[in-house]
Amino acid sequence: MKKVKKEKVIGPVVPVSYNRSILAAFEKQAKGKTCPLCNIKFSLASYRSHMNVCKVADDDDEIKVMASYTREEAILLRAGPEIVLGEENSGQEIPVNPKKKRRTGEEQLESTPNPPVVQAFDFDVPGPSTSSENLDPPSESSEVRSVEKEIKKSPVWENRRRSTRLAQNSQKSQSESQEAIVKKETATVLEVLASINNFETRIANSDRPTPYYVKCTVKILKKIISTMKSDGDFYADNFWLPSDIITFYRFVECLSDGAKCLLVRLFVRKPNWYHLEKLEQKYTEILNIRGAAVELMKWEFISDDSTLKTLNEALRISDITVLKNVAKKFKIDGNKNRQDLVQSLRKFALSQQSIFGGTGSVELAVLKSLKTELGTCIKIKDEMVDLFKCLFTLYCPVTTNSANVIDNPASTNVYQDLLYMMLSVENGSVEFPAPNPCPNIASFYKNRAMLMEYVTAKALESSLVLQMSNGDHDIALDLAIDAKEFLDQMPLEQKKYYESLEIHERKFTSIWVHTRCCGHATSVLEKQKKYGMAVEWQKDLLITNKDVQSCCLDSRGMWWDRMLLNLDSHLKVSVFPSYSQTKKRFFQEKTECAKMIQIALTDSSILEKELLSIQDRALKLKEMPPDFRPPLNIGTPMKRVITARTISKSLGDGRVNRFVFRDEEKEEDVECSVEEAARRWYIENDEFTTGVHDEGATWHTLFGLLFYDIIFCTDAVMASVWHSEVQDCPSDLSNTLYLKRKEKFEERFEWLKDADQETIEDNIRRIWGMKQNETNRECSWKHFQSGIEDCVSIFQCIPRPAMLSIFRRLAENYRNSRSGFPDLTLWNPEKKTVAVIEVKGPGDRLSTKQRLWLSFFADNGIKAEVCHVEAQNSRLLV
């Protein structure tokens, strides 16, 4: 049977209501909607995205949850008029004017110096539309009509207390709300000082102790912005950027105590990424560390892991557990150590191709997996690190000097050391010779740019030294090249200003540090055996570049010595086909070395120890002119050879000689140093009864006691050498020590020459009693086991003329003669004899500094010897 196709019946056309027509939609789109917060009109297309940005501030105390609803109810509310869901609040009466009035942002800052921490500040909850032009709902079901009918009868919507996020207020209340919820974006130094005073008052009246590192950081900030510089000005608003001042204000005023603690902890550590969970375990004094992290992110002090965008950074902070979990996900062998796992994941991310042929998506997938396994990670922002480094540098440039890392590799964190020293001074466990409180401040930075350049230069040098110690010579050389480019691009006026500063101030400038970085470059090139390039860098520092010849005066002699060594020995002569050509080239190199020696001898900045080394090289060089006369004339020191017992067995630490002596009381052999073995030999076999291994500490202590008021003078004339309370010496305890105190030194030398023995001894006892608990650069109290009596007894054994000559050499050229003293100082109080002994073990040789001091002691009538200790093997290990 054939099927009959039914005809489609078309009914009458029903007109569409205007509210659901396309014209209404265009009209509504053209009208747009007005933001209830900023009172700006937006199109419907951009209104939703704008509301995601223009949301209620985190400190708004007028937000109140009026109702909760499901996803379906939210859809209906967006499509309908202004409605309030639920009947449970229909009978409640909510006053239109609440008792608690809104206060302006200024009033809040005055009354609440520490606003509460907001744990979460994402108020992206969709609310009912406030527009009266909403489209009709798509369907007119009975359920929807009943809900709408019930809600319209409720009077709560009209009388309720409305949130600024949900409804429009009057123009006046709207402006007040915006003042309350918008973060303070500007501040002045006076406001920062007021906040600091409020902070100090609050912690003084609080029962809960504030961590020392927070109090010390605030103390540093207060001194920087409130202490007058030497020119009568302050580090005020015209010195700092507006962003710097608002950062200071937010740190003191807006951050909670926990957030302050976390920020300072992150600052004194390396600026790396850190696991929040590990920080929570490490810093138990921070009660709510997660809330503190949220607060610091809100005020833009730190970054969260959303900015962790490189695979190398993620791999660097991942522990072995995280790496194994990620390796398992990508089916990589996880039975490896951490270093091998890092290499495997990096190789996998860079070698595997995605379906589109690239490796980027695979790398992103590995990075995403690492971030998932790591959890929450935070990092202090680089601009915050630089800003706080500026504060610490201004407070104490001596302690925060990057040269401390070179001289003492254990000082890896100078900023943490500074905070700890401030704590020690505050609780009285350590005393320093600096005035406390110190009324002075470093005043040689004309503007913020100069200060920031110096801070950046210190960071560059620290990185360069770290790369050198790790053996990454190529990276270290790149950093040195950056320093060289900075010097070449520095304006001439700025170079002249730096040259006008005194030496003890000039060493805290960027030009000084970058010049020192160029000196590091020569060491890097020598380690790479690129002696030709090293010579070119050294010539530039010493001869060609006139702008840096007033910098790093202490290092110029060393650079000269290394350059001459490279020219004389290390620089290989190219082999030419002809022997005569090779010989000619060799002669040219030696002639160049002789020429450089003559130029070096005219450099007044060369210290005696390098001058002696250059003189030794000149005497060996045949190409020197026949009329050459050595500038120094030193004799050969007396030598003595002794034997001491050593252990013949190796204990596995690489030491060849282990000296021992017999302890008769315990009847056992005791290990000792070669200096101790020599000291015991002299006391047992020579005329001396007392001796110490001090390497000059005894002589420095006597010098410090007799000239204490001159060296550590704190009057107004010497104000520029004291910058903070934690200095253990004036900043000019170097080349310019004598020049700034010449008259006082000469008066003291005349007094020591004519004063009787008892008067000088009484003066030594008086200074010892006053300063024996003080930590300073000159006096080493621990080397005198019997205290002041040992110190007086050795003073009685030193001939007066010899003592004056030794102390004059120290005073007039402190930087050149502060080191190199012989190892042992021996004396006999009964016979009034004294001697200095330089001890050398098997294979050791004298340095130029030691040769100079031995010659100087001998020339002034003090017994000076070189004691060579030979090993006498013992087969018994007791």
Swiss-Prot record:
GO terms classed as biological process: interstrand cross-link repair
Domain spans labelled VRR-NUC: 757-870
Molecular function in Gene Ontology: 5'-3' exonuclease activity; 5'-flap endonuclease activity; flap-structured DNA binding; phosphodiesterase I activity; zinc ion binding
Keywords: DNA damage, DNA repair, Hydrolase, Magnesium, Manganese, Metal-binding, Nuclease, Nucleus, Zinc, Zinc-finger
Signal sequence extent: none
SMART domains: VRR_NUC
Composition skew (Basic and acidic residues), residue ranges: 142-161
Catalytic reaction annotation: Hydrolytically removes 5'-nucleotides successively from the 3'-hydroxy termini of 3'-hydroxy-terminated oligonucleotides
Low complexity composition-biased segments: 168-179
Name of the featured protein: Fanconi-associated nuclease 1 homolog
Organism per entry: Caenorhabditis briggsae
Organismal lineage: Eukaryota, Metazoa, Ecdysozoa, Nematoda, Chromadorea
